[in-house]
Curated annotation (Swiss-Prot):
Residues modified by glycosylation: 49, 222, 244, 351
Membrane topology value: Single-pass type I membrane protein
Domain statement: Binding to ERLEC1 is mediated by the oligosaccharides linked to the kringle domain.
Gene that produces this protein: KREMEN2
Domain CUB: from-to ranges: 219-326
GO molecular function, one term: transmembrane signaling receptor activity
Cellular component, GO annotation: early endosome membrane; plasma membrane
Domain Kringle span(s) in chain numbering: 35-119
Organism per entry: Homo sapiens (Human)
GO terms, biological process: limb development; negative regulation of ossification; signal transduction; Wnt signaling pathway
Protein name (record): Kremen protein 2
Alphabetical list of PANTHER family matching this protein: KREMEN PROTEIN, KREMEN PROTEIN 2
The keyword Transferase is annotated on this UniProt entry: no
Signal peptide (from-to): 1-25
Amino acid sequence: MGTQALQGFLFLLFLPLLQPRGASAGSLHSPGLSECFQVNGADYRGHQNRTGPRGAGRPCLFWDQTQQHSYSSASDPHGRWGLGAHNFCRNPDGDVQPWCYVAETEEGIYWRYCDIPSCHMPGYLGCFVDSGAPPALSGPSGTSTKLTVQVCLRFCRMKGYQLAGVEAGYACFCGSESDLARGRLAPATDCDQICFGHPGQLCGGDGRLGVYEVSVGSCQGNWTAPQGVIYSPDFPDEYGPDRNCSWALGPPGAALELTFRLFELADPRDRLELRDAASGSLLRAFDGARPPPSGPLRLGTAALLLTFRSDARGHAQGFALTYRGLQDAAEDPEAPEGSAQTPAAPLDGANVSCSPRPGAPPAAIGARVFSTVTAVSVLLLLLLGLLRPLRRRSCLLAPGKGPPALGASRGPRRSWAVWYQQPRGVALPCSPGDPQAEGSAAGYRPLSASSQSSLRSLISAL
């Protein structure tokens, strides 16, 4: 690309700007407020040590005292998952959000998710009430059994909308700022349903929309705000093969500072280049074999062009980087006050579809990801041989923490049966292969699908 083309690209007109809102959970306008840059909070390294914010909820156990469970500081000797001699919430197994153990033994509910207000990736605006009349987001909508966050973002980006909302695990809605102006925030824990197309992502809840800015995971953009966040294409899904994406970066100031919050490329053929926008000269290049520095990276240019290319086989989590403009190349690295992100949200030029389609599963980070799909299959197998001492009662399963394994109910992946008969019920451990097992639960209603959306709603439905 020639110098004139680079200059022209830098100064492309950009779409109307999204204004910051105090209600936003993790807006791209305020990246400094977020402690997480992955959609499931696997990168959370904060200090919340209770399941609720500001002292609410149950206290977490110390990770160096949980050897009886599947995850402890002993299982993370290199600190890859952030475990250690502390009791802060973490996500060592790639679950949908950080969690912690709350009980010494695996009797009853021995772990819980953590509600961490500061752990929402920039670009996620929060959980909103959707009563349906009128809808929380008034633009086009669709459903998909393979819905992921990025599938919905791509759909709404293609339609020309600023915001995308995921609901009930399978529904996607598009909208604009005016919709959120009359919207009503819901508790973050209300958006607790797993995306049908990705076991490691949450897609809203029953009557609850998880709302995102569509610029998240965009393949191109023109970024001129004093500071902000740029994600790899298709984020929070993995980037796909043969991606060729560019972002023009020109915040006010004489120099730039970049900090990579996440960087995971598949191999040396997947490459991110940083070029001076005026001259086109290559300043730095990173790939799967040559990652960027862990700390801030300063560049003596006021305008930058980032280009990412993946090969025909490329699939990995990608990258998330924060940037800020510096008034002087020697400026001390201190975040400016009151800065705001002003992303452009142009339509992706490639890999877009008129209807939601499946995204790729997230890449394994160390040993933390255990397939939820496999776990569900194991649980279904266990269901066939569960206890049947109580006639005409139903058994519903909720996963424990640990690698999937068949065997006794006290195994590392134990399951829990909810035996209930209206109007009351009780949670009991399932013991596969019980000789008293008997037939189906004729005459007793099953829990509704919405009541099975998470461990929390499953137990609270009793």
